[in-house]
């Protein structure tokens, strides 16, 4: 994937590679020690396939991202194989 400023990710829609609407990017989690983006903080869409707690965002591992253009595309076939946590604030 090509490089882009992190601020361009905010409020982008997230779509699964099978067509599901996942949600919107609200924040990012960056590991300064290794210099990598670790997770996307996501506000789940109403009918998103990810489990959600009312009013709480979730963290989706960045390794699921397959493309970033006008939307962020994630590998939704592996959503149930990764640890999706509730974002702490």
Curated annotation (Swiss-Prot):
InterPro entries per record: PRC-brl_dom, PRC_barrel-like_sf
Highest rank taxon of the organism: Archaea
SUPFAM superfamilies the UniProt entry points to: PRC-barrel domain (SSF50346)
Pfam families the record matches: PRC
Protein name: Uncharacterized protein MJ1118
């Amino acid at each position: 994937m090509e490089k882009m400023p992190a601020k361009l990710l905010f409020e982008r829609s997230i779509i699964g590679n099978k067509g599901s609407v996942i949600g919107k990017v609200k924040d990012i989690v960056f590991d300064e020690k290794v210099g990598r983006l670790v997770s996307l903080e996501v506000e789940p869409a109403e009918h998103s396939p990810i489990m959600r707690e009312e009013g709480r965002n979730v963290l989706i591992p960045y390794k699921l991202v397959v493309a970033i253009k006008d939307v962020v595309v994630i590998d939704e076939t592996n959503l149930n194989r990764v640890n999706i946590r509730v974002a702490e604030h």
